[in-house]
Amino acid sequence: MKDVIIVSGGNIQRDFALDFLKKNEACLIAADKGLEFFLEHQLLPDAVIGDFDSLSEDGKKFLEIQEEKSMDSEIPYGGMNEWKVQKGFGNEIKEIKVIRLRPEKDDSDTQSAMNYAIRTGAKEIMIFGVTGNRVDHLMANFGLLILAQNQGAEVTLVDRYNY
């Protein structure tokens, strides 16, 4: 599998992130509220993972519409519901894998996205939107570095000051 870029729901420096995404061909995963970054910029991730508790009403509506369109809706996947959808912006048509997690879980949505990436063969994972204002979230995200390393993958927490 090619490299993976996960966009989480924290602070994202828009211009830096958009430029980075253009320059790096990678599998794109939105972790919960990270979906809103993609939708705001008319980009499509390859996968969306989360319990979607922090999505805006527009983000939730997008997922509801996709779920209604899906032929594979409500396929159980170990505590998750998973479906694939096709969505296009302009001329782009793309299949998006959506994994809905149960709200009662031990892992953060970002950690679940990272674990999914590793399970599917990713060895290098870059994560945006994890170096924001909340120190408790930042500390938890530092833990992802060790968790990934223990599973044979390398994680980089990316923002315009750290890459």
Q: Where in this protein do the model-derived segments appear?
A:
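Intrinsic disorder
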Residues: 70-73
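General beta-strand structural signal in soluble alpha/beta enzymes
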Residues: 7, 29-32, 50, 99-100, ...
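Class I SAM-dependent methyltransferase SAM-binding "motif I" and its flanking Rossmann-like core
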Residues: 146-163
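Short Gly/Thr/Asp-enriched flexible loops that form oxyanion-binding sites at enzyme active sites
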Residues: 136-146
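Ordered, amphipathic secondary-structure segments that act as subunit-interaction surfaces
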Residues: 101-137
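Glycine/small-residue-rich loop that forms an oxyanion/phosphate-binding "nest" at active or ligand-binding sites
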Residues: 59-67, 94-115
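N-terminal beta-strand-loop-alpha-helix module at the start
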Residues: 1-65
